[in-house]
């Protein structure tokens, strides 16, 4: 049996094809971008699952945000903290991350420089002052003065002292026994009641004036009657005009008649 084939035939010439590099250099094989393969995969995926799931809604186009160095967080920061807190807690790390980004060679036009590292702004004094309540000078004035060892007796402005019930009670007790105080007793009362000597002195002056006003009688100017044990000689010496009348009344009527006869 005779075998006839192309391999056995000696007249057969082996075809020679150029390598693939020559095809790519001569643009015989078109080069596709990566987007082309992505489109084919997406189209095939949608083709297989188009019946099961509806097409997703179109995504809105958001403007690209330019991130600065403040948005970078250090390795020690916990998740969820904002850029202000990261810069506040780790200022050294944030400063080390603030470096100019290298320019890419693909961009022909120079890209705008990133904004400078924003440091945490200090709190405004007006906001801190608005939170604190306003205290006026008249609110700082304490009406009940305390004991001052260096008190020299002079005050810039006199103010009405508001005495407490305990202070008034102790002063009334002292006034009941002593209407006039000595210097030593005044100092003791001032220290015990947390008052100054001047305040004790003024209170006793006012209390004495009130006592005199309350005990003043309407007939104080009328001469009072003499006591029962007084001698009549003192009264006669005090009033010479009335002594003659008393002597005449003391003589018996017979002597008066004798004197009248002698006068005739």
UniProtKB/Swiss-Prot annotation:
SUPFAM superfamilies tied to this protein: Homeodomain-like (SSF46689)
Domain of life from the UniProt record: Eukaryota
A cellular component annotation (GO) from this entry: chromatin
One Pfam short name: Homeodomain
Ranges of compositional bias, category Polar residues: 233-254
Keyword tags: Developmental protein, DNA-binding, Homeobox, Nucleus, Transcription, Transcription regulation
Compositional bias annotation for Basic and acidic residues: 32-51
Broad class of where this protein is predominantly found: nucleus
Spans through the membrane: none
Compartments it resides in: Nucleus
InterPro entries noted in UniProt: Antp_homeobox_Deformed_sf, HD, HD_metazoa, Homeobox_antennapedia, Homeobox_Antennapedia_CS, Homeobox_CS, Homeodomain-like_sf
Region annotation Disordered: where it falls in the sequence: 19-130, 214-264
Biological process annotations from GO: anterior/posterior pattern specification; cartilage development; embryonic skeletal system morphogenesis; positive regulation of transcription by RNA polymerase II
Role this protein plays: Sequence-specific transcription factor which is part of a developmental regulatory system that provides cells with specific positional identities on the anterior-posterior axis.
Protein family per UniProt: Belongs to the Antp homeobox family. Deformed subfamily.
PANTHER family: HOMEOBOX PROTEIN HOX-C4, HOMEOTIC PROTEIN DEFORMED
UniProt name for this protein: Homeobox protein Hox-C4
Species annotation: Homo sapiens (Human)
